[in-house]
């Protein structure tokens, strides 16, 4: 195990570092997006849909859209590999569709950013996707509420508290992360 910890803890550590990297670069990406497009971005919070679903886009755009930014860890050193299109990342397609639904917007700006390159895709609200998937999500939500209401069932599905990784390998990775974010 590269970080000197059990595999599941190592994966969680990597996920935390990767997520932190993206959040750290979000303000610069917003500024870059505004310069590239001429659009203004307004910070926003959480948008609730009915009483069971919600989303928090990275901003609202002056043309009536939502903004979703991704700053991939894999592009941190300027590798030449191109960004994946949104069509090749269905999890993010779902994310922007739900953001538009919750925020009451008809389009999304999906902006992938690194200090070396950017990819901007404009995505319309896909009503067919909404009509097909929102009922499924509503059913999943109802089933989840049933599970967590039962302590016996919940124990099988809810994750245990995370373990803190404190190894030399983990510290080296954090030093690299700190250097990249300065």
What residue ranges belong to the model's regions?
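Accessory terminal regions of nucleic-acid processing enzymes
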Residues: 1-182
């Amino acid at each position: 195990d590269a970080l000197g910890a059990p595999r599941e803890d190592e994966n969680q550590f990597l996920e935390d570092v990767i997520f932190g990297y993206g959040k750290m670069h979000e303000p610069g990406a917003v500024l870059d997006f505004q310069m590239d497009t001429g659009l203004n971005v307004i910070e926003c919070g959480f948008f609730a849909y009915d009483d069971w679903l919600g989303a928090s886009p990275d901003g609202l755009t002056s043309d009536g859209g939502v903004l979703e930014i991704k700053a991939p860890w894999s592009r941190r050193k300027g590798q030449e590999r191109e960004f994946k299109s949104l069509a090749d990342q269905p999890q993010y397609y779902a994310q922007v569709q739900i953001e538009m639904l919750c925020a009451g917007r008809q389009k999304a700006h999906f902006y992938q950013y690194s200090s070396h390159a950017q990819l901007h895709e404009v995505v319309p609200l896909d009503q067919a996707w909404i009509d097909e998937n929102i009922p499924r999500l509503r059913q999943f939500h109802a089933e989840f509420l049933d599970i967590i209401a039962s302590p016996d069932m919940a124990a099988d599905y809810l994750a245990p508290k995370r373990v803190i990784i404190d190894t030399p390998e983990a510290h080296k990775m954090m030093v690299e992360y700190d250097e990249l974010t300065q």
